[in-house]
Amino acid sequence: MTCFARWDDLIDKSKDYNEILIMPTWRSWLDEAEDSTFLQSDYYKNYSELLHSERLNKLLEEYDLVFNFYIHPKFKDYISNFNVTSDRMRLIPYGEEPLNELMMRCKLLITDYSSVCWDVYYMNKPVLFYQFDYDLYNTIHGSYLDMEKDLFGYRSLTLDKLLDDFENACKNNFKQPREYEIMRDSKFAFTDRNNSARIVREIKKMKIFD
């Protein structure tokens, strides 16, 4: 096992920024849906509720945080349907800022089922999983992880639980919970930013170019 070459470029920059990143993945059943259909979806309703949460806004103020909402590229045309009521929240259209930069700057990631969780976890930052539509998503998409047993971050099915977990993370200065710090050693064979070199060595061993 070599780990991904792209992880060599990941540097934790969070000490210089007070940013939270939220990046949910897409839903195949909403792909290319009309705006009228999208606006009636649980996806839109739940993320809109989060963005308009008074409790969340108070936490952002209290801990001097900026909340970056970065929509999946397959849903980029829907971002105009979202709005925020706080200058501590930013709606970032796909491509406007490099995703890896947002991941490096964030103190914590909120996602649902997106594989970006691995990049953030690689940097040993806390991840919160917001899975309000888990039953439907699991039925249609399935998963390579057991979402009830194998996640490396606190899981919530409701907004209240998510905000409880987020508030606790704020109070703990976004320190990785001990249980997930220990788990990290079993998830990554290496965390030394030498993955590219290992990949090259393994390719040479295969003697593909002889």
Each model region followed by its residue ranges:
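Donor nucleotide-activated moiety binding/catalytic core segment of transferases
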Residues: 73-118
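Conserved catalytic-core segment of nucleotide-activated headgroup transferases in glycan assembly
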Residues: 5-81, 156, 191, 195
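Structural alpha-helical scaffold elements that stabilize or flank donor/cofactor-binding regions
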Residues: 59, 101-102, 148
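Short, charged, surface-exposed secondary-structure boundary motifs
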Residues: 11-12, 99-104, 138-144
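Helix-loop-beta element that forms the nucleotide-linked donor phosphate-binding surface
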Residues: 1-3
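C-terminal alpha-helical cap of glycosyltransferases
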Residues: 192-210
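Catalytic binding pocket for nucleotide-activated donors in carbohydrate/polymer assembly enzymes
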Residues: 82-84, 115-187
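Short, well-ordered alpha-helix to beta-strand connector turns
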Residues: 17, 105-106, 124
